[in-house]
Amino acid sequence: MAYPFQLGLQDATSPIMEELTNFHDHTLMIVFLISSLVLYLISLMLTTKLIHTNTMDAQEVETVWTILPAIILIMIALPSLRILYLMDEINNPVLTVKTMGHQWYWSYEYTDYEDLCFDSYMTPTNELKPGELRLLEVDNRVVLPMELPIRMLISSEDVLHSWAVPSLGLKTDAIPGRLNQATITSNRPGVFYGQCSEICGSNHSFMPIVLEMIPLKLFENWSTSMI
């Protein structure tokens, strides 16, 4: 999860988030090199008094600054396209969870079970227990098995919402009348926090998301106790 004065991204918990982190570093390095070159050229222009008065054209330079940006854009586009396809790919999910956005809470339905559904509201500040996080805790967590592909079906009952969990690399719009899907695969157990990431009204800031990833055996015990 995020912490005060954090400079980097949240720790990656899913393969997709690991890919996104690597792509961020790859792109940032390219931007850093380009920025350094531009600053170097600007410093040369400000410090030198020499002027090429006889230079009317420079075909070699024009060729370089046409081809080089194209190569750089390709170096950015290819990894980006790969990640886009990976994010859309869903192979044999073991579980499907339907998520509905409301003003201002989330409801969840485990479609593989006959009667396993619940609403998830933010825990008020005056009801928090020691060690719990303000504006991030909920009364009912989404419990899921770790290391297994899980399909999330996301929609909304009223206005636009966005279901986002940064450490899993997830952000999917919840749109009324439309069903979007995303894949979750957690590499490790833990509790992961997210929030609604689309301004949806006066209580937009009070729609937290809490995922609890546990081993499959513990998930089976939990689902049995909930039915």
Swiss-Prot record:
GO molecular function: copper ion binding; cytochrome-c oxidase activity
Topology, Mitochondrial matrix side: 46-59
Co-factor binding details: Binds a dinuclear copper A center per subunit.
Listed GO CC annotations: mitochondrial inner membrane; respiratory chain complex IV
Entry annotated with the keyword Translocase: yes
Catalytic activity: 4 Fe(II)-[cytochrome c] + O2 + 8 H(+)(in) = 4 Fe(III)-[cytochrome c] + 2 H2O + 4 H(+)(out)
Residues binding Cu cation A1, per UniProt: H161, C196, C200, M207
Domain of life, per lineage: Eukaryota
Entry's EC annotation: 7.1.1.9
Main location as per UniProt: mitochondrion
Keywords for the protein's UniProt record, in alphabetical order: Copper, Electron transport, Magnesium, Membrane, Metal-binding, Mitochondrion, Mitochondrion inner membrane, Respiratory chain, Translocase, Transmembrane, Transmembrane helix, Transport
Pfam family, one: COX2_TM
Compartment(s) where it occurs, according to its Swiss-Prot or TrEMBL record: Mitochondrion inner membrane
Gene3D superfamilies per UniProt: 1.10.287.90, Cupredoxins - blue copper proteins
InterPro entries named among the record's database cross-references: CcO_II, CcO_II-like_C, CcO_II_C, Copper_CuA, Cupredoxin, Cyt_c_oxidase_su2, Cyt_c_oxidase_su2_TM_dom, Cyt_c_oxidase_su2_TM_sf
Protein residues bound to Cu cation A2: C196, E198, C200, H204
Subunit structure: Component of the cytochrome c oxidase (complex IV, CIV), a multisubunit enzyme composed of 14 subunits. The complex is composed of a catalytic core of 3 subunits MT-CO1, MT-CO2 and MT-CO3, encoded in the mitochondrial DNA, and 11 supernumerary subunits COX4I, COX5A, COX5B, COX6A, COX6B, COX6C, COX7A, COX7B, COX7C, COX8 and NDUFA4, which are encoded in the nuclear genome.
NCBIfam families: CoxB (TIGR02866)
Protein name in UniProt: Cytochrome c oxidase subunit 2
Source organism per UniProt: Gerbillurus vallinus
